[in-house]
Amino acid sequence: RDRLKEDSELLEEVVVVGMDKQKRNTITAAVATVKSEAITSRPVTDLTSALQGNVAGLNFASDAAADGVGGETGAEIKFNIRGVGSINGGEPYVLVDGIEQSMQNVNPADIESISVLKDASAAAVYGARAAYGVVLVTTKSGKQEKARVTYRGSVGFSSPINMPQMMSSLEWARYSNLRDESMGRSHQISDATIQKMEGFMQNPYSAEFPGIDVNQSGDGWAAADNAQYANTDWFDYYFKDRAIRHSHNISIQGGSEKTSYYVGLGYIYQEGLMDKVQDDLEKYNVNTKFSIRATDWLKFNFNNNVSLSLLKRPLANQTIFYGTIANMSPSRVTKLPVEQAEYSTPTWNEQLYLQKAGYSQN
């Protein structure tokens, strides 16, 4: 006969709730907990990504509204608990070791546990700030044990989920002429140019296409005049299929009856998906915790968390460039050898646009 044995391990689990800790079997509020093992086992570069799939009821989305970014290198991932709470959105109240700060500044390797308070009971402690839920992040501390040194490293790759499929230059030319016909205008692309485009797509290395020389006047190359020279997929040209990311973390932890300490050092590198230009993110984290028990009733805690992010990418708003690529004609060549004035920003040649517009470093 089969017998069911009671498993009380989860019932005895200690959960951080508001200003205190409680056993799970005494909690009546809706609380979800994520332990450090579930976070460090995933090759993520930020804490928000580590929550995905670990907590039910969380909805994630790239921050594409505030500053125009969405999915680019270093973009913050926004999330809400059980859906949007108001017409203006609203975000959960995030506390790291009792101090309000962004989850982007926390190294996932330093996390001890995360508690997500989902219902209105959190407002009893945090007031109106808890209207959209509360996320309590607890970082690792020293323990009464011999000094222990731990290293964790990971390597992974990022890939675009979905890239637009551009039409060929021949399709573009025919649709452009159909547009002109519907508007009662003459064709933008001549039949002779379309014949050259067909020949170029069949054999781009034919002697019929000698190439393009430098345009000394600097007035650019019109797509209609040189459409026979290219059949360019601009998304394939400017974006990579995959980008590498890796992280390295080392920590030392220990203590005695009177003192305890924890020191964590972290480095994260994330390569961007843009090609032909520098597009990457580097993050440095230092987390230190020291605890000294002077007497039975007096204890000193010294906590310090320092985060430095170095983001290098072309243009201040990368989404604008993404939209520019979508509007580029596939009949343009990838590199137009045009002499450009020192202080002029070419809007028709995106490669020069990237080079001349400068970089944004934060």
What are these language model-derived features?
Residues 204-207, 217, 229-230, 307, ...:
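Acidic/polar loop-and-plug regions of large Gram-negative outer-membrane beta-barrel proteins
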Residues 64, 155, 306-312:
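A general secondary-structure junction signal
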Residues 1-287, 294, 299-301, 356-357:
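Short, small/polar-rich motifs associated with maturation and membrane association
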